[in-house]
Amino acid sequence: MWWATVHELSLCQAIAGVVRPYAEGRRVDVVRVQVGALRQVVPDSLSFCWTIVREHENMPEAELELEFVTAEVRCRGCGQQSEIASRWSVCCPRCDSAEVEVVRGNEFLVTSLEVS
């Protein structure tokens, strides 16, 4: 699946773009990122792509730590807020309605850095 790696490569480039201004010439040791279950990220591909991007962004030692966020929806029909098991179906597990609002699971956020 080369297209999955291309997707993760662009995500890693975006991460580096966020990190760069905050590093301000210091060594980046750790980058922490929240990834929602609905973002269709392949963790192994993201980690692999990070090893490539960090070399080109002058942060060769920077480790990528991922925190995965489960998907949760609130049903507009029955009002139930539920965790969903499948990233392919965001229907309400209680009443099967597709009229839902995603509460969690769309995150893709750099949450913190460690620099030295």
Regions found by a protein language model. Give the residues of each.
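Long, charged N-terminal interaction/targeting segments
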Residues: M1-A62
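Short cysteine-rich clusters marking metal-coordination/redox-active sites
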Residues: C75-C78, C92-C95
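Cys/His-rich microdomains that often coordinate metals
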Residues: Q81-S82, E99
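Short Cys/His-rich "knuckle" micro-motifs
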Residues: A85-W88, V102-N106
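Cys/His-enriched microdomains
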Residues: V73, V90, F108
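Immediate flanking context of iron-sulfur cluster ligation sites
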Residues: E65-V73, I84-S86
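Short loop/turn motifs enriched for small/polar and acidic residues
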Residues: Q34-L38, E67-A71, L113
